[in-house]
Each structure stands twice: as C-alpha cells, then as structure tokens.
Amino acid sequence: MLSLDLVFSFPAWALLLVLTLLYTLYLATTRLLLSPIRHIPGPTLAALSFWPEFYYDVVQRGQYFRQIDKMHQTYGPLVRINPFEIHIQDPSFYPVLYTGPTRRRHKWLWAARMFGNNTSAFATVRHEHHRLRRSALNPLFSKSAIQRLTPHLQHTLARLCSRLDGFAFTRQDVDLGIGLTAFAADVITEYCFGQSLELIGKDNFGKEWIDMVSAPSELGHLVKQCPWILVVCKWAPKALVRALLPGVALLFQIQERMSAQIQPLVDRAAAVDKPADPLTVFDFLLSSTLPQHEKTVDRLKGEGQTLIGAGTLTTGNALKTIIFHVLNDPDIFRKLRAEVDGALENMDILSMSDTAYLERLPYLSACIKEGLRISYGVTHRLQLIAEEPLIYSGVTIPAGTPVGMTSIFMHDNPVVFPQPREFRPERWFEADFETVQAMNRHFVPFSKGSRMCLGMNLAYAEIYLVLAVLFRRYEISLSGVTREDIEMAHDFFDPAPKEGARGLIVQLQKRG
C-alpha cells in the first residue's frame, strides 16, 4: 500500500520521465548490448532507434538513402542502419543475397507492409508462400506470353501516336512523360482486367489517376514505421482522412477500385464449371490451381494494386529518362536516329509480330540499358532474410537478420561503371568482354533472384516499341527541360524528381 501511495504521489511529469528513462535503458540493453548484430558497425542512434530513418524518409521525404551512403563512407561496406537491419554496399554480394529458389529467402514483415497490403506476391513474407503465388503469375509474364501480347501493345501505342499527332499538328508543348506513363497504365490495366483505363484519351493523359497510383509510394515510408495509421484511418470519417492524410485516402481509393474491378471476374469464374481460355491476368489466376483462399477479392485486390503500380510507374519513369538523355545529347540522338532509320526503313513497327528484331539493334539496346541503369528501377533497398548465416568479408551475419542492398549504389559504383552519372550508351559495347560481363552482373534495375521483378519482359517490350516508333515518327525537342526536371531527388520506393519538377516537356513535329 505504501509503495502505491508513493507512486501516486509522484507528479505525472516525473512518472513519465522515469518510465521514459526505463524504456530507453531497456532499448539500449536489448539493441546495443544484447542484439545479435551488435558487432556490425554503424551509428549508435540508428542501432538504438528507428527515429533517424523516420526523420530522413518521412519528414525529409525519401532521403535516408543518402544517409546510408554516408554511413558506408564512414564505417565501410557493411553497416547497421537501424535496430534490426544491415545494409551492404558491395556489388559482389548481390548474387549471395538475391539468389535463386534453391536458397530460402524471406521478406521482412516490417518492410513488406509498406504499401498497405500483404496479399500480393511482392509483399508475401514467407519463401514458400511467395513461391506459390509467384508460380501462378510467372506464365503470364514469360517471354512467350509477352510476345503474344505484342498486338495489344501495338494497338495501345497506335492510340498514343494518334493523340501525339494532334500535339505535333498544333506545335503545342506536351508532357511526354505523363503520356508514356498513361500508355503503360493502359497496357497493364487491359492485360489485368480486360478493360483499359483509356488514360491516353483523357485530358492531361489522366494525370490525376497517375498521381493517385503514385501516392502510396511516398506514403510507404510512414506506413512502414506506423502501420497502425491504416487501421485507425479505416475507422475514421473519410472527409477527415482526406484532409489530414490525403495519401492514405488515395491508397484506400485504389484498393476500392481494385475490388470493384476484380469482383465481376470472381463472380464470372464462380458461375461457370469450365472456364474458357483465360483472357486476362485475373481470369488466369481464377482458373489456376491456386487454393480457393488465394482467389478471394480481398487477396487479389492486393495483387492488382501491385501489378498496376509497378506496371505503370517504373516503365513510365524508364521511358522518360531514356528519351530525355537521348534528346539532351545531339550526338547520341544522331546515332540512335541513324540506326533506327536504317534498320526500320520500309518496315511498319506497329505490325511486327514481336520485338525480337528491335532487340537486335545494338545502339537502341545500349540506350535502353543505360537508361535503365541511370533511372535505377526501384530505388529503395530490398531487404531479404536468410535462414542460414551469411558471411561477408569474414564477418558473420546471423541467420534471420534483414539484409538490404540498393540499386542506386549498384548502378552508381564508379569501379563497375566509370563516370556513373553520365548517360553513355557506348559503355555497353565499346568495353572489352570481361568489363561488359561485369557490368551485366551489376545491372539490377529489375533486381535478381527468385524475387526479381515479375514484369521485366513486359517492360522491355514496351520500351523497345515506344522508342522505335517515337524516334521514327517524330522530330522531338526538349522544351526548357533540364536534367533536374527528370533526375531522382527522392526515394519513394520508386524514384521521384524534385518538388516542382516540370517533367519531360517536349515539342513534336511529324516527320515526312
């Protein structure tokens, strides 16, 4: 009784201070003294707390990758960047971490939940569960499947060209970056649902929808740190959520749209005993051998959110980056135009059976690889957990430790890619064989291993077709755009330019 009286006689602020000190002591003991990764070098504050990452990624908006780079400059290639995670900045370790299906690699739940869904193959934590979900999707994005999709890509690209012809006729500036992102969105939505969004025909290429799809990318930093926010917001009045956390409101809006798109497909699949040949991604999944609990609307809406986001934003950004750098260097533009004109004379690109011929054009291919390298693909570190201890440079990384690597540091490595921030397509065919092989090993815009990007073949097909058609069909010039309007300034999982960036504004003129 006396002890309780003593506690309640304390001022509230004093009690709070004591509890805070005790909690800090507990964290210091468990995270600094008892942690299985206490031997990994790194800043003490980062080992003690997630606050540094919160500050740089949430408050400063996607800047923690810069701090990680500074940590590596201070502590070396192996760094502890938060209480539980290690980051490695050494290209030679990439195939060890991002390995094939024979080595079990799990995702880290703390990171996997950043987009507010855990039902997509991308966000699946356990290795076996991911393999189940991914195996159902793989046939849809194989090289042969994308070849069969070529007429659909050409039809959508023809619609984009028809729209761009109007800008060419009026000599009006056009945001080609948004137009190309709309093209990618129309392609992936029609492939997923059998119905395109028709963004190409909308005012401003449906930029509002593209902004909505982009919103969860930046929001992911906050959700990762504070997952309870989504739970609270689901119960809060929608008007309040829109006012206080518009990114959360947009995320919920995307998820509602995914449910609305998928529900009719689920109903249709349930209504027939023997479905016809599947026409869309979700028709295929619903007719697959996946267990029934993997075919619910709640499960598949997460798959839809991931496929639409990845299939829209990363392809659009890659195209925007490549076209800017080609136009920004007259010599590169001249070489690419000469190759495309010479190789495709008297050929109709929009009626080719596939992109194999385009893929054999050396300078076009080099421009694409260099653009993918310099735009990074996904810019956020991709953490995986190995079941076995990993050894790096004689240091043991305990089993069960989240380990991440980042495409930015892979692609900007000056040893592998001299003058890494220069857009230089020639590096891919002028170097000797061993150097090119080394560059290929460290070229990871789609990551590698069993969890590499599902849509790589689709992205390549879109990029080859778009570049060949645009540079054959139009004279294109930049309209007051600088590299800062294109280049990554924020890591929102996907790369994002600086606030107020103009984008890829161009003028078009149809060639004779």
Swiss-Prot record:
The keyword Heme applies. Heme binds at residue 453. Its cofactor is heme. Its main location: membrane. The keyword Isomerase does not apply. One of its GO terms (biological process) is secondary metabolite biosynthetic process. GO terms for cellular component: membrane. Pathway: Pigment biosynthesis. It holds the Pfam family p450. GO terms for molecular function: heme binding; iron ion binding; monooxygenase activity; oxidoreductase activity, acting on paired donors, with incorporation or reduction of molecular oxygen. Glycans are attached at residue 118. InterPro entries: Cyt_P450 (IPR001128), Cyt_P450_CS (IPR017972), Cyt_P450_E_grp-I (IPR002401), Cyt_P450_sf (IPR036396), Cytochrome_P450_monoxygenase (IPR050121). The chain crosses the membrane at residues 6-26. Its EC number is 1.-.-.-. It is a single-pass membrane protein. It is found in: Membrane. Keywords: Glycoprotein, Heme, Iron, Membrane, Metal-binding, Monooxygenase, Oxidoreductase, Transmembrane, Transmembrane helix. N-acetyltryptophan 6-hydroxylase; part of the pathway that mediates the biosynthesis of the gray-brown conidiophore pigment. The first step of the pathway is performed by the nonribosomal peptide synthetase ivoA that catalyzes ATP-dependent unidirectional stereoinversion of L-tryptophan to D-tryptophan with complete conversion. While the stereoinversion is catalyzed by the epimerization (E) domain of ivoA, the terminal condensation (C) domain stereoselectively hydrolyzes D-tryptophanyl-S-phosphopantetheine thioester and thus represents a non-canonical C domain function. Belongs to the cytochrome P450 family. This is N-acetyltryptophan 6-hydroxylase ivoC. The gene is ivoC.
